[in-house]
Amino acid sequence: SRRQRQMCIRDRYRKQLFVDKSQEGRQAVIYFEGANQEVRFYLNGQFVGEHKGGYTRFCFDITSHLRYGQENLFTIYVNNVYNPNIPPLSADFTFFGGIYRDVYLQFMNPVHIATNDYASSGVYIRTPEVNNSAASVEITTLLTNNTLQPAEIRVENVICDADGKEVKKTHAEIKLASGETKTDISKKIKIDSPRLWDIDDPYRYMVYTRILDKKKGTLLDEVVNPLGLRWFKFDSEKGFFLNGKGRKLIGTARHQDYFQKGNALRDELHVQDVLLLKEMGGNFLRVSHYPQDPVIMEMCDKLGIVTSVEIPVVIAVTETEEFLQNSVEMAKEMVRQDFNRPSVMIWGYMNEIFLRRPYTEGKQLEDYYRFTEKVARALEATIREEDPSRYTMMAYHN
């Protein structure tokens, strides 16, 4: 729309940051929780990387670009000028630009839980079997050795209850070659008489995934993820069931902007929205039409709000392979970044996709329909492959 185009800008951000020499030899990764919509990142005048899409997290490994014991110049170019190959193309919300979510720099041991998997935690928790009497848990961990030597490590997964008391613990011993990234899949972990995650009792365990040096026993890395044990299904005639009980879903959709603030919000405002939903009797949030700040998902987990999360393929598509590929990449980012959220039960990938068709009749319209179907099938297949445990969604009216 004309209003949306008026908000399109090109920004440059610059920051000087002193990096202590004590960090030399460690892995350095910079994370962006959201910047709209095309980013080009430079460090000390050297190009590091780029990212397309304004609503998912991304990160860059900057280890080889840092200067230790001195100042470093971080330069980030961000523009949200209309690009027909990057969704969303058009919608009923404003496409604010710039860096509008948190940015942080993380240092870690060069032998660590992988950071290069679509800015995910590097740990994926699956619950293939859950019922009132028992639950099974599988934990997949991506491991990276960025040293010049092979590494012998011990991988531990510790499941703790909400009070921090250990419930279950598993371990495995792994050898990593220099420069290798390897996947460790835990054996099924059984939890007897689990306390379930539910709308009225959103109980969460926590999973501590640790890497230790096998010989010395020293901690190399640790990642913490939530674990909510629940099972659910949708029935076309009977509705939604959570943990075997029929539940009526009552809720809203939510956009991330506020009057006179745009979408660069403090955490308190995100928290306030979810609290208001809970206080008015809601139990469902459509996180629309794009992945939102991590604090939104954290609050939905904590308060027992069932969620659907979606990528911003809204109203229209562009008939190019680049548009299709960018959409697929967004879907992978979305699923991997929120994979461990117990509140997420639906992944969405299209909204009112034929609302503004570029053609009215004839072969052009038929070709447009066919390409839109191609995008839909690609996104459906991608999400099903990434996470077969949840439902998928396309939203329409009329």
Question: Which residues does each predicted region cover?
Answer:
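Short glycine/proline/serine/threonine-rich loop/turn segments at secondary-structure transition edges
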Residues: 23-26, 66-71, 150, 190-206
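Conserved, mostly hydrophobic/aromatic
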Residues: 45, 103, 205, 244, ...
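Short, solvent-exposed loop/linker segments at the N-terminal edge
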Residues: 127-135
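Substrate-binding/catalytic cleft of secreted carbohydrate-active enzymes
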Residues: 274-276, 284-398
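N-terminal carbohydrate-binding accessory modules
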Residues: 123, 207-277, 298
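Beta-strand-rich binding/interaction modules
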Residues: 41-43, 134-175, 183-185
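Accessory beta-strand-rich segments of carbohydrate-active enzymes
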Residues: 1, 6, 10-116, 120-122, ...
